[in-house]
Amino acid sequence: MYNTLNSIIYLIETQNFKLSKGKLGTNRIQNVGNALETFVKDLYARSFSSTKKQKEKNYAKTFSFMDSSNSPPDVIIRGGDALEVKKMEGLFSDVQLNSSYPKYKLRIDNPLISNECKNCEQWTEKDIVYAIGFNVKKSLRLLWLVYGDCYASDIEIYDNLKITISEGIRNIPDIKFEETNELGKVKALDPLEITNLRIRGMWTIQNPNRLFSDFINYDASTKFQIICLMRNTKYLSFDKESIKSFEGVIDPNLFVTDVSVRDPNNPQSTIDCKLITYKIF
């Protein structure tokens, strides 16, 4: 079974935290993102040491969807969670989400996801894992695996804000609008009517190192560390064999802690979560 618990076990077994080259382009920041995405896919598909041909087979077996564009998510585990891979520009700087707002869950009615994603398997809603990495040169120093329902609010919060902004733009007099999934698109802005304007949201979310600093701190003495945060209900939803295997791991650098996290939909209440950390020195 391919899931987050088994992926953490695999990382402990392999002790691997090196980034491969991934798909190389002319953009250095994009190259880092590609390498991180490859690492996360290899982690979940247990493919760190696989040949290219074997890796392709493992990917096909593990994932029902892998995206090559900018629409969310990056990956869907077959019969399991969705994965969205993001990189940290700094240990405490906001995480860039670009034009896609944060997700509590991934829903099939999200207008930003592709038809290929909607039709990859039978589903209506998926738990989503934000895999957020921080690297120094070619070495991954920190990887967060934080579930969206510990991190982001319900989709209605962001949708309502988007609708309010879009309607405000539409109320500007004497300009022409075109239907779009973005905040707005204005046409024919100049006397020749040849200039258009796309209005896009550029979303960010607070770095988990900052948001969850009450119970986790980055350990600069480590070569690598992974931090995973999920609700207790999510932890217990994994198959019994995965839970048994994970709880059978004996390693002095693996820590599993019960923590209370502010509810993203109601900060006055808390949710019971599992915090899993593993460090390589």
For the regions a language model picked out, list residue spans one by one.
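Nucleic-acid endonuclease domains
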Residues: 1-72, 87-281
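Short acidic loop-to-beta-strand element that houses the catalytic metal-binding Asp/Glu
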Residues: 69-82
